[in-house]
Amino acid sequence: MPKAKAKTKNTEIISPHHYVYPNTTTLKNKYGIKNLNAFLEKCSHDTAKAMINLREESLPEYFDTAYLCHIHQQLFKNTFEWAGYLRHIPFTFADGTTAAMPEMKRTGWKNAFAIGDEIQEGLQRLDQTLAEKNNLQGLTREEFNSEAIELFNSLNQLHPFREGNGRTQRLFFENLAKAAGHQLNFSLITKERMMVASVAVAENGDLEPMQHLFEDISNPEKIRLLKEFMHTMKNTGRNVNDRPVMVAKEGETYTGTYRGAGLEGFALNVKGAYIIGNIDHLPPEQLKILKPGDKITFTAPKAEELKKTLIPKETLVPLTKLEIAEMVAEDAFVHTCRDQICSLSKIVYGSQGVLNKNIIEIIKNPSKGQQLATQIERTPYSVHSLAGFDLICFKTGARVRAEKHVALLSCAVANFTHAVKHARQEITKEHQAEQNRLRQEVPMPSQSLQDLLSLPKEFQQKALGVSPLLQKELTSLLQKVNSRLSSSEQRALRENNHETLAKNLGVSEQKAKEITKTVMKAREVQQKSQTRTVSHSKTLAMAS
C-alpha cells in the first residue's frame, strides 16, 4: 500500500476540506480544472481509458489491500495526486496543504462509513479472509457469490478512498471472480440499481437486492439478457443509468408495460424499473403481436391494421381453469360462505381447517360440493372424527354440540357450492362481455366524414344537414366508440390523457392523439346537431 507523503510543515492543519479547491465542491486535480462538470467529464474519460488498460493486465497472485490500492492508483493517477492513498491517512498536496477524511457519510444516509482506524482494521480482515479462503477459488458460482457478497458489502462500508471507491471496488471483484473461474460483469449494473442495493444493505441490513444483483451479473444466461438490453438502449441513445435494470427473478410475478423484445429477452417497465425476461417464457403468439407501450396483458394490433382503423380490436384469451378458480376464491360472497364453513367446522370437527382441501376441490370442480354436503349430512364421521367424545352412555358437551351443528355444516357446504357456481357464472359472463367489448374494431371514418370534421365549425352543420348518409355514419361511429371504450378509457379520452389512453388501447401516443381528436370533434358535431334539432323542433312547436 502506498504511504502518505511526509508533511512539509509540522503546523499544517489537517482537514478534509483540503481535498477540494477553496470555495468549491471540486476535488483538487492534476488538470487544474475547478469547474465541477468539466472536471467530472475529464475524469470520467481518463478513468474509462485506464479501466481498459487495467482489464488487460495479468491477474495478481494475491487479492488484497495492496492490489485494491494499485487499481485505484492506476485509475486515478492522471487525476489525483492522492491516487492509491487511503482517506484516513493524512496526505500532503504539492500546494502544501494536508488532507484526511477519517469520517465520511453519504448525503441522505443514516449510517456513516467506517471511521479512522476502522478502515485499516477492516482492510486487514479482508486480506485475511481472502488469504484463508484462497481468493475464493474452487467454489461453485453460487458459493463464490455468497462469499463475495459478504466481502463486497464489507468493503462498501469501509469506503477506504476519498473518491473512486465504486469503480475501484467493482474492478477488484471482477478480477477476483475471473481468477476463481467465474464472472462478475458490473458494467451491466446501472448506477441507480447499485445505489438501491447498497442502501438496502447499509441502511436496512437487507441482502436480497445485492444477492439478486450478483446473480444477474454472474449467471451467463442473465448476462446475455442484460447485454442485449443495454446494447439496444445504447443504440437508441437512451440512458437508463438512473433506472434499476434487472433480470426477472424466478417465481416472481411482474405486472407492467411491455417495452419491446430483442432476440433473447423482452423488457417490462414496472413502476419505473426495467425487468428483463427471457422471451422463451412468453407464448409465441403473444410475442408476435406485442408492441412497446402495451400492457403485458394486452394484445396489440399489427401495424397495418392501425392504418385502417381508428380504434383497433383486441383479442382477450379465455380464462384458464386456474385463473377462474383464483378469481372465484377472491369473490366476496364465496369468502363469506367459506368463513361460515370454517366456523362450523371448528364446532363439528374441532378444527377450522378440516375441510380446506375439500373447499379447494369445490372451487375447482363445483360438482363435488353437493356430494360433500350429502356425505356430511348422512355420515359426518366419514369426513373426519367429530369433536368431543361419545363413551357409550355419555357424550361430552363438545360432541353434543357437534352433532347439533352437522346439518348446519352440510347446509353451509351446499351454500358455498352455490356461491362458487354463481361466482363462476358471473366471472365467465363478465369475461365474455369484456372479450366482446375488446374484439370490436372501430373503423376509420370515411374520407367524407373526415373532411366534414376538418371543416370550420360554421360549415360543419350545413354540410351535415344536406347529407343523411354522413349523419348516419357519424351516429354509427360514436355508438361504436362508446361500445368499444371502457369507462377509464372514456375518462382518459375526455381528459386528453393520451399516455393513459395509448397504454390502455395498446397503441402509440400519436395514435391516441388521433383517436382523441377525431372522437372529440365527432362528439362536438353531433352535440351541436342535436341541439340544433331540438331548437328547430321547439321553434316549429311554437309556430304551430
UniProtKB/Swiss-Prot annotation:
Catalytic activity: L-tyrosyl-[protein] + ATP = O-(5'-adenylyl)-L-tyrosyl-[protein] + diphosphate; L-threonyl-[protein] + ATP = 3-O-(5'-adenylyl)-L-threonyl-[protein] + diphosphate
InterPro entries in UniProt: BepA_ID, Fido, Fido-like_dom_sf, NA-bd_OB-fold
UniProt keyword terms in alphabetical order: ATP-binding, Nucleotide-binding, Nucleotidyltransferase, Secreted, Transferase, Virulence
GO process annotations (BP): protein adenylylation; regulation of cell division; symbiont-mediated suppression of host apoptosis
Compartments, record wording: Secreted
Pfam families with a match to the protein in the record: Fic, ID
Enzyme Commission code(s) on record: 2.7.7.108
List of residues binding ATP: F93, A94, R106, T107, E163, G164, N165, G166, R167, R170
Main localization category: secreted
GO molecular function: AMPylase activity; ATP binding
GO cellular component, one term: extracellular region
Highest taxon in the source lineage: Bacteria
Fido domain residues: 63-216
The keyword Thylakoid appears for this protein: no
PANTHER family from the UniProt entry: PROTEIN ADENYLYLTRANSFERASE FIC-RELATED
Chain's role: Adenylyltransferase involved in virulence by mediating the addition of adenosine 5'-monophosphate (AMP) to specific residue of host target proteins.
NCBIfam families: T4SS_effec_BID
Name of the protein in its database record: Protein adenylyltransferase
Organism: Bartonella henselae (strain ATCC 49882 / DSM 28221 / CCUG 30454 / Houston 1) (Rochalimaea henselae)
Gene assigned in the entry: bepA
